[in-house]
Every structure is written in C-alpha cells, then in structure tokens.
C-alpha cells in the first residue's frame, strides 16, 4: 500500500474540500452501519458552518458538543473549523455540575446535544448556553435548511485555535487546553520530513478509534486519518467484544487504543489471533503499559506496534516508540519512545537545571504541536509553558540515545524513608506475576518511614495469589524499600473515561481530605 501524505494541507479547513475533490466516494466515517463519504462530510460540514454563522457566531466563539461518537461529531468538528469557531468536546460521562463548569468556563454560546444527555443539562446548576441544537431526528432538517456550498473564507492559519479540550481534572478543576490547527498536522509533517514510518497512513486503511473524541488521543487519531483520506470507524463507546468484531468483520488495518482496551480485548472469551489478521499497526498510549501485557499483545495481534507519549498540552504525541523497538525482552520495551524530528526533550531538577542522561527529573518537551494556552488561566499557562517548553509533570530520564523513559507522575512518587519510589516500576513487575491481571500502587502514611507502599491487586481470572506469593515474586526483582508492605485485592481498577487510572481515588482512602498527601 502507498503511504499517504498531503503536505499542502495545513489546516482542517482544507481537509474535507481536498478529499471531496480527490476521493469523493471514499468512506470518511463508518458508524453503526452508517457510511459518510468524504463528499458528504464536506457538504454536511459546510452546512453546519453556514448555520453557525447564521446563528450569530463569530470566529473565536466556543461551540460545545455533548454526545457520544458518531458521524455528526466529525461533521461538527469540520463545520466549526470552517466557521472559525472553536469546538469544545465535552466528556459525556461527567455529572451535571462538571458539565456546567466546562460550558461556563469556556463561554460556550451554542451546544450540540444528544438527546440522552438532555437530563444532564437540565440538572446543571448554571444556565445552559443561549442556543442548543438537538442531535435527534430534527438535526438533518436543521442542516438541510442551510447551503452546502463552501462558506465564505475567514482568516485562518496553522496558529488559529480550532479546539479546546478539558484536562481530566485529576488535581482540581479541569483546565481548557486551547489547540490550534498545527497541533493536528505538525507530527505528520515531521515523520514525512525524515521518511519515517513510525506511524503511517496508507491507501485503503481503515482505522478503529477506541479512544473517545473528547480525549486528545481520539481526536488526534481521527484527524490524522481524515488528513490522509483514509476511513475512520467510530465507536459510540468502547466495548471490547464489539471492537474485536469490528476489526475482524470490517478488515480494520490500524487501531488507536489505551492499554486498558488491549487488556479487555485479549481477555474476551474466545478471542485470538484469528480475529486480528487484517491489522498491520496498533498505536497505543494514554497510560503506562506493563511489559507482560505488551508482550501478550504483540504475540496475539501479530502486527506492528507504536507507542505514543504526550499530553493534551503537547497536542497529543511528542514522543514515539517505533515498531522496530518493540522487541520482547529488549532494553527499550520500558521506554516511552524517541522525540519526533523537530521535537526536543530535556530533563530538569527542582531548580530548573538541565540534568545529564540517566538522571531522573521532570521531563520537558518542546514541540511545534504544543497548546496555545490554558483558556483564561495565564498564570497556569506560564507555569506549564516556559520559553516554548511544556513542563509535563512526569518524572523520567533521557538515555544517551535520546530515548525518553517515564518513571511516573512526579506527584505520584512515594517517599519511603527519604527514597523516591515510583509506582509504575512496581506495577510493571507485579503484573508479570501470572496471578495478577492488574496492579496499582500508592503511598500510604506511615509514622516510622513517612510512607509505605500499598499495592491494590486485581487477580487474573481463575487465580487467587496470596500476599506471600506476590512478596516472594517481587523480592528478587525490587530493592527492599520498594516492596509493598501491604496488598489489597480489588475487583477492578477505577479509571476515568480516557482509561487513565484514578490513583487519587485509591490514595484518598488513606489520606482523606488532607491537602498534604506526604509525611
């Protein structure tokens, strides 16, 4: 298959018109048996752009979407881009007060709303946006009342804001991360500039998006495929059995998932290599992956794997572990990856001094895909974006070859008798035990040592490992101060809708409402 790269496309305004002209009948979106071609995507997004202008919205105004994945979401994405408005995708799993905060904080003027989330809006403590467009049966008529011709051009450059995504709010209220068009083109261009196929798009590709569109990973993966002119398979909400069936039945060639989704697919009864024969590449990221899960995934899916690392603030991926580095037992299997061409990395200490290779500190990234700002939070922006560098809040190091290794979130480090202990290291070893499906490690208060290591464990199906079994397994592999002092077995690990572990929820069992979660 031929690789696809269209360097003349530099904004999402250009994407649908280009592909409507060159491959009008190619499916752009497949969703629950419905097909939207590139010509249809172009025309329907034109209608939405005209409608937004008719509703009095001007470039820079915020437009929110509260609903699950569907072809309408992508029509609205491109309609916003063409009208100059900024799309605010809202996590549909949030409560009414949480949704209200996002709509109020962003200053949303118009809300696209799926019917099933109407009760959420009704319960919001603040007034809803001035205009609500229902995505039910009346939506087609609403669109049809507007022209499908190209809207009057507005001033747009790669630096023009196009989306505002809210962080998951694991440490306080969610912040609105403003992203420009360049966030969805810079990495594609970087790979093409060096002829790298770490992640690539090819003629005939059909891409599964398991990650929600309100998450940077889902939105980025969708736009990369639209920019290439390939087909996106949208899942209303991720379900492991459905994902496996879609891969097998639709002949899906690429997929973008978080590690938890890989685990769920592999543990579905009867699932095996026969279900993944058309896959050529799996892109994963969003949370740490254990070596055991990665090696099992490589064996069963039997395709190329690429890990992506980044933040919403970096415009998704800034670092990639390419397929060639995915060698079971290899030294790079624990790496986050290598910066793309044009992306720089460094590690700093608490005083902001750059550290040498191998020294652990805060990972910082300078990428052309980085955010514009935190919406309405200049002080927070200045803390995170310093002289072009995004301060990730992740503890890690860079090796002599430039590969980035992430140890953990800095705030998640456990301080045991003055020694920093990183949960991800312990979790990775624990999940290598055949009786462990998943493990989460947190620090709990200890009067003698400051903190002790507490391990939450989800047992593998049909297994009942004892704390003694796990301790015996860990002793040869970890220093004594890293060993969990206690093990607690749980049925499942709490996660947010993006698949990230809600570590704070587990930690708060020990620390309660204390603002200082360290002794």
From Swiss-Prot:
Required co-factors: Mg(2+)
Catalysed reactions, semicolon-separated: a medium-chain fatty acid + holo-[ACP] + ATP = a medium-chain fatty acyl-[ACP] + AMP + diphosphate; a medium-chain fatty acid + ATP + H(+) = a medium-chain fatty acyl-AMP + diphosphate; a medium-chain fatty acyl-AMP + holo-[ACP] = a medium-chain fatty acyl-[ACP] + AMP + H(+); octanoate + holo-[ACP] + ATP = octanoyl-[ACP] + AMP + diphosphate
E.C. code: 6.2.1.-, 6.2.1.47
Keyword annotations of the record: ATP-binding, Fatty acid metabolism, Ligase, Lipid metabolism, Magnesium, Metal-binding, Nucleotide-binding
Organism annotation: Streptomyces coeruleorubidus
Pfam families in UniProt: AMP-binding, AMP-binding_C
Residues where ATP binds: 216, 312, 394, 411
Signal sequence interval, chain numbering: none
UniProt keyword Transferase, yes or no: no
Name of the gene encoding the protein in the UniProt record: scoC
Any single biological process term in GO: fatty acid metabolic process
InterPro entries xrefs: AMP-bd_C, AMP-bd_C_sf, AMP-dep_synth/lig_dom, ANL_N_sf, ATP-dep_AMP-bd_enzyme
Protein name according to UniProt: Fatty acid--[acyl-carrier-protein] ligase ScoC
GO molecular function, one term: acid-thiol ligase activity
Chain residues that bind Mg(2+): 167, 313
Entry function: Acyl:acyl-carrier protein ligase involved in the biosynthesis of a unique class of isonitrile lipopeptides (INLPs). Shows a strong preference for fatty acids with a short/medium-chain length (C4-C8) in vitro, and accepts alpha,beta-unsaturated fatty acids such as crotonate, which seems to be a physiological substrate. Acts twice during the INLP pathway, catalyzing the activation of crotonate ((2E)-2-butenoate) as well as (3R)-3-isocyanylbutanoate as acyl-adenylates (acyl-AMP), and then the acyl transfer to the dedicated acyl-carrier protein ScoB.
The keyword ATP-binding appears for this protein: yes
SUPFAM superfamilies reported in the protein's UniProt record: Acetyl-CoA synthetase-like
Family membership noted in the UniProt record: Belongs to the ATP-dependent AMP-binding enzyme family.
